[in-house]
């Protein structure tokens, strides 16, 4: 009985928290990713005008994920969510070749912000199930990720609807959090 109590206490005390900001251009799949992680299922989404926030429990870490709308008119509001962000998830529609430069500009603009200087960067190269999707290496090149010399970053190929790659991304974030201590 004491062992059960000890394990429970250890799990309660040992739980870590990580504040995650998930952004990207509109229709990249941010909300679908959030609810696939939270509920394990696909939900019908509409364009996010404000934000969605959910807590995702994974590997004894409580990820508080802020999913903020990506339409161009509301992107200036992203900066209001920067404070205390430990991890940034930037979601890219791997099939949207026409807007990948726009995605790069938005990402670089954000990464220049002082409030995000210590945040680690996880890029989800989403929609990998589509036949014309750019692979992770191509997205890495087009986003200029190799130029990020002083920031921990990782790119993960994902498919939000199937869940492929999502937990691998969370694994990387979890390891980053553990290494910060």
Curated annotation (Swiss-Prot):
The molecular function terms of the Gene Ontology recorded here are: GTP binding; GTPase activity
Q: Which PROSITE patterns match?
A: ARF
**According to the Swiss-Prot or TrEMBL entry, at which residues is a lipid covalently attached (N-myristoyl glycine)?**
2
| Protein origin, superkingdom | Eukaryota
| A single GO BP | vesicle-mediated transport
Q: Extract one GO cellular component term from the record.
A: extracellular exosome
The secretion signal range is none
Q: Name one Pfam family in it.
A: Arf
Principal localisation: Golgi
**Keywords (A to Z) from UniProt:** Cytoplasm, ER-Golgi transport, Golgi apparatus, GTP-binding, Lipoprotein, Myristate, Nucleotide-binding, Protein transport, Transport
Query: What transmembrane ranges does the database entry give?
Result: none
Q: Which residues bind GTP?
A: 24-31, 67-71, 126-129
- Where does it reside? Golgi apparatus; Cytoplasm, Perinuclear region
- Which Gene3D superfamilies does the record match to this protein? P-loop containing nucleotide triphosphate hydrolases (3.40.50.300)
Main function: GTP-binding protein that functions as an allosteric activator of the cholera toxin catalytic subunit, an ADP-ribosyltransferase. Involved in protein trafficking; may modulate vesicle budding and uncoating within the Golgi apparatus.
Record family assignment: Belongs to the small GTPase superfamily. Arf family.
Subunit-level organization: Interacts with PRKCABP. Interacts with PI4KB and NCS1/FREQ at the Golgi complex.
Record-given protein name: ADP-ribosylation factor 3
Q: What is the lineage of its organism?
A: Eukaryota, Metazoa, Chordata, Craniata, Vertebrata
């Amino acid at each position: 009985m004491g062992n059960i109590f000890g394990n429970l206490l250890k799990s309660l005390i040992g739980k870590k928290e990580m504040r995650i900001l998930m952004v990207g251009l509109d229709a990249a799949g941010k909300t679908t990713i959030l609810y696939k992680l939270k509920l394990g299922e696909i939900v019908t989404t509409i364009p996010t005008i404000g934000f969605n926030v959910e807590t995702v429990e994974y590997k004894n870490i409580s990820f508080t994920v802020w999913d903020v709308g990506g339409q161009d008119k509301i992107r200036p509001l992203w900066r209001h969510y920067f404070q205390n962000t430990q991890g940034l998830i930037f979601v890219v529609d791997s099939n949207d070749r026409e807007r990948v430069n726009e995605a790069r500009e938005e990402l670089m603009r954000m990464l220049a912000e002082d409030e995000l200087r210590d945040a680690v960067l996880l890029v989800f190269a989403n929609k990998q199930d589509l036949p014309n999707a750019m692979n992770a290496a191509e997205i890495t090149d087009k986003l200029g990720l190799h130029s990020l010399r002083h920031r921990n970053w990782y790119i993960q190929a994902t498919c939000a609807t199937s869940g492929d790659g999502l937990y691998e991304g969370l694994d990387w974030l979890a390891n980053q959090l553990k290494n910060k201590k």
